């Protein structure tokens, strides 16, 4: 008997705010899709957008390319949804993301890149981590891609993207996922012996040589005056 998905509450996120923009600006994400029989150039853009979404820009390598899946997508043998699933389940994605992270962080990465939103809370991380531990990686990916949330927002033909990163009601948008969630977590950085740039002593202020006070400048005597004032 399989363990049911643990219930978790929702939290306030931009993607839960309905948009009523008449003409969205260039800051809004572009939805790449194959609805209108794209040309060869447009199909290249769709494929590139899929790689950029799933592997993020810092993981797009020659080893992550999937020419067989690309060929199937170009000849309409599979849908964009199948292409996304193939990239997620590829060996290269597993090595770059699953093998170097714990289940909680891997859940966060997959929710961001597949569903286009951040995790709601720690309980959602726990719920999906239990799925990975009990049913395996492939079942976890299938549950995300076959979910109602994915179907309502992306369907079979749209490349996932970060939903509603910028809304008119707020002066600042949410941080892009590729900047918010780097490849390694803090625990794996320590495990791999990566340098931690932590200064042990006080950080002194640096002043360029041309801005240093010269002989006769009253600023040279400012420190002495302050010392006298405190006595």
Swiss-Prot record:
Choose one Gene Ontology CC annotation of this protein and give it: phycobilisome
Domain PBS-linker residues, every copy: 11-191
Which BP terms from GO are recorded? photosynthesis
Q: Name one Pfam family in it.
A: PBS_linker_poly
InterPro entries with a match to the protein in the record: PBS_linker_dom, PBS_linker_sf, Phycobilisome
Name the membrane topology term. Answer: Peripheral membrane protein
Report keywords, A-Z. Antenna complex, Chloroplast, Membrane, Photosynthesis, Phycobilisome, Plastid, Thylakoid
Q: Subcellular localization, per the record?
A: Plastid, Chloroplast; Plastid, Chloroplast thylakoid membrane
| Function field | Rod-core linker protein required for attachment of phycocyanin to allophycocyanin in cores of phycobilisomes. Linker polypeptides determine the state of aggregation and the location of the disk-shaped phycobiliprotein units within the phycobilisome and modulate their spectroscopic properties in order to mediate a directed and optimal energy transfer.
Entry's family note: Belongs to the phycobilisome linker protein family.
* Record note on quaternary structure: The phycobilisome is a hemidiscoidal structure that is composed of two distinct substructures: a core complex and a number of rods radiating from the core.
- What is this protein's record name? Phycobilisome rod-core linker polypeptide cpcG
Q: Which organism is it from?
A: Porphyra purpurea
């Amino acid at each position: 008997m399989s363990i049911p998905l643990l219930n978790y509450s929702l939290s306030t996120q931009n993607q839960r705010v309905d948009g009523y923009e008449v003409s969205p600006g260039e800051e809004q994400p572009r939805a790449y899709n194959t609805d209108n029989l794209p040309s060869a150039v447009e199909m290249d853009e769709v494929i590139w957008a899929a790689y950029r979404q799933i592997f993020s820009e810092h993981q797009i390598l020659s080893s992550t390319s999937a020419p067989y899946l690309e060929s199937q997508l170009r000849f309409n043998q599979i849908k964009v949804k199948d292409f996304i699933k193939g990239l997620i389940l590829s060996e290269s994605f597993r090595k770059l993301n699953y093998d170097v992270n714990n289940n909680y962080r891997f859940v966060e990465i997959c929710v961001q890149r597949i569903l286009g939103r951040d995790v709601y809370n720690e309980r959602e991380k726990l719920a999906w981590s239990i799925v990975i531990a009990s049913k395996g990686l492939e079942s976890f990916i299938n549950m995300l891609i076959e979910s109602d949330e994915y179907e309502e927002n992306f369907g079979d033909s749209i490349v996932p993207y970060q939903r509603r990163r910028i809304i008119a009601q707020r002066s600042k948008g949410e941080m892009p996922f590729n900047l918010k969630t780097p490849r390694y977590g803090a625990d794996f950085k320590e495990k791999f012996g990566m340098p931690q740039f932590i200064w042990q002593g006080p950080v002194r202020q640096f002043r360029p040589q041309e801005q240093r006070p010269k002989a006769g400048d009253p600023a040279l005597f400012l420190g002495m005056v302050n010392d006298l004032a405190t006595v």
